[in-house]
């Protein structure tokens, strides 16, 4: 482990750094313009990431992104069987997400998400906060589980939600103007407050 390492790590274009532990690069910032691969990693990644490269979660990785990644404009890739979780907007920065695994968003605050989220993976909403999606952030095709708080659609025109299955759990809420592509299951205690669904 490099837990005491506290210097900047720079990943150049066409270069790759592969980690099998969240403390593999210590506590320092990561300037990623290449490829940072998390391979069979579990735990909290507290490093702050910047740059325009790719962060790839592979081989059953399950990582919580805790760093201030506000300056990261690259891409998070979540492979099948892997998972990333975030709590705040700064954890995703301005990056896009290709999600073929599981993305968990646990927020206690309101968050208007403008990130592009695509892929066949699932999204789980936890926490009491309101997560507002647009067409780009609602482009993923996997299952949506609203376990806590609310997923809202704030546009005057209907947002196209590509998710094939939507589960609104007890205390979960879905609201706004939305056109859905798949089936919807509102469980006891869940609430659906939408202007339009198909």
Task: Identify the function of each model-found stretch.
Residues 1-34, 39-52, 64-101, 106-120, ...:
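Surface-exposed loop/turn positions within long extracellular repeat scaffolds
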């Amino acid at each position: 482990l490099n837990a005491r390492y506290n210097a900047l790590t720079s990943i150049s274009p066409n270069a790759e750094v592969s980690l099998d532990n969240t403390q593999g690069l210590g506590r320092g910032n990561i300037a990623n313009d290449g490829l940072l691969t998390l391979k069979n990693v579990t735990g909290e990644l507290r490093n702050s990431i910047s740059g325009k490269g790719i962060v790839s979660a592979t081989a059953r990785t399950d990582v919580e992104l805790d760093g201030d990644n506000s300056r990261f404009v690259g891409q998070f890739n979540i492979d099948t069987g892997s998972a990333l979780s975030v709590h705040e907007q700064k954890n995703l920065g301005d990056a896009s997400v290709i999600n073929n695994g599981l993305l968990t968003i646990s927020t206690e605050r309101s968050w208007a998400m403008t990130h592009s989220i695509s892929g066949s993976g699932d999204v789980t909403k936890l926490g009491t906060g309101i997560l507002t999606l647009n067409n780009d952030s609602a482009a993923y095709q996997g299952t949506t589980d609203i376990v806590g708080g609310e997923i809202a659609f704030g546009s005057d025109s209907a947002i196209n939600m590509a998710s094939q299955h939507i589960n609104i759990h007890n205390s979960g809420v879905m609201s706004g103007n939305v056109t859905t592509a798949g089936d919807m299951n509102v469980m006891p205690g869940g609430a659906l407050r939408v202007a339009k669904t198909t």
